[in-house]
Regions:
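Acidic, glycine-rich active-site loops and adjacent beta-strand->loop/helix elements
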Residues: 1, 22-27, 48-55, 192-196, ...
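Glycine-rich phosphate/diphosphate-binding loops that line cofactor/substrate pockets in enzymes
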Residues: 9-14, 101-107, 148-161, 181-182, ...
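Conformationally flexible catalytic loops at phosphate/diphosphate-handling active centers
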Residues: 95-98, 102-157
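Conserved thiamine diphosphate
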Residues: 15, 62-109
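A short, small-residue-rich loop immediately preceding and capping a beta-strand
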Residues: 12-51, 222-230, 376-378
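Hydrophobic or amphipathic alpha-helical targeting/insertion segments
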Residues: 27-28, 34-77, 106-110
Length: 378
């Protein structure tokens, strides 16, 4: 009956309620309440203790397969890792945030958080729980539930602001007025895979810049605010840089609202078109001159020359890029080819495509053939 009691609490208070249980069949006893909560769309959080995965099927007490035990009756089911290092800690935090955010994502519902615990089970020595990261998600920019004026105004508290644009299709382009406002306030990092969803002044050779920076420079010129949008970013170096020197705030804009924590420091997700977001967001930016932070990255970018390596794969990529005609389409294979391309200037109207979803090189030529079949472009 504990599940029904929790359901009643959620019904009466209008807020999520949690029910906790031990491992084994104690979890199955909650099944009827979980089914009822599913059809009433009640925000219920089921938290179950569990034995380690290695104990399942080994005649250990109170042990059954618990991950995803409720299947389609919950909006999300997560099994937390047993935290042994920083990566486990990040993963655990991310999963809990994902589960709790799903309670009200695209409608109400309930979630299951499964918590494996190894022996000893009764040795609790922590006197005070630590502060943990909380990720917030905003579905649209409706003022009914959120004060976006207050949220967006906070951006002016930060002085070292950066945007990273991920892979996007060529058909998506920003208004010039938005580009100009963002240019005055943000350092833009972009690979060519982002196409024209970035201003003409964006920094494309950032991977090479990071390679030249000292540890002191990396720390000093790391962003305190990061804004991201789009799909995949190839550069491992920028991911390592931001994980080592994380910003105080990382906002990600995605039309599906997915929790994608590429840099390990995500704090807010805006489920909205990036065009709608930036049109609204930039109106809150206070007028400023070009800051030392922007000037540093622009200077470093200009100091990196195009490589002159004739007898190498880098040289081959460079020689091909120099011959590309404007308004053509460039299909890149993956990984190293994308990184090499970043070292050269590609005409702005060239569309760049790459099968970066799975980061595999198979199908690159076939994709280019399929594209060319319906295109008049070179």
């Amino acid at each position: 009956s504990a599940g029904y009691v929790a359901m009643g609490l959620a019904l009466n208070g209008g807020k999520p309620a949690a029910v906790c249980c031990t491992s084994g069949t104690a979890l199955l006893n909650l099944h009827p309440a979980v089914a009822e909560a599913y059809y009433q769309q009640i925000p219920l959080v089921v938290i179950s203790g569990d034995r380690p995965a290695s104990a399942v099927g080994q005649m250990m007490g109170q042990t059954i397969p618990q991950p995803n035990v409720f299947q389609s009756l919950v909006k999300m089911s997560v099994t937390l890792p047993e935290v042994k290092d920083d990566n486990d800690d990040w993963y655990c935090n991310r999963l809990i945030n994902e589960a709790l955010l799903e309670l009200y994502h695209n409608g109400r519902g309930h979630v299951h958080i499964n918590v494996p615990i190894s022996e000893p089970l009764f040795d609790f020595t922590t006197e005070e729980l630590p502060e943990v990261r909380v990720i917030n998600r905003y579905e649209g920019l409706n003022e009914y539930n959120n004060n976006f004026e207050e949220i967006f105004a906070k951006i002016n508290l930060f002085t070292q602001r950066m945007v990273i644009a991920g892979q996007e299709l060529m058909i998506y382009q920003f208004d010039d007025a938005v580009n100009q406002r963002m240019n005055r306030h943000f350092v833009w990092f972009s690979e060519y895979l982002a196409n024209q969803t970035t201003p003409s002044k964006c920094i494309t050779n950032f991977d090479a810049i990071l390679y030249t920076l000292t540890e002191e420079e990396q720390k000093k010129y790391s962003p305190d605010f990061l804004l991201t949008f789009g799909g995949h970013v190839v550069s491992k170096r920028v991911k390592q840089f931001l994980k080592k020197y994380p910003p105080k705030e990382h906002w990600h804009v995605a039309s599906d609202g997915a929790i994608v924590d590429t840099y390990g420091c995500l704090t807010k997700v805006f489920q909205v078109s990036v065009f709608e977001f930036l049109d609204r967001f930039t109106s809150y930016l206070m007028a400023k001159e070009n800051t030392p932070y922007l000037r540093f990255w622009e200077m470093k970018s200009k100091q990196i020359p195009e490589p002159q390596l004739d007898y190498s794969s880098v040289g081959v990529v460079g020689s091909l890029i120099r011959k590309i005609a404007p308004d053509s389409v460039l299909h890149l294979a993956n990984s190293s080819v994308v990184r090499y391309a970043q070292l050269f200037k590609i005409p702005r109207k060239v569309e760049v495509c790459c099968n970066r979803g799975t980061a595999g090189i198979e199908g690159s030529l076939s994709t280019a053939i399929g594209y060319a079949h319906l295109s008049d472009k070179l």
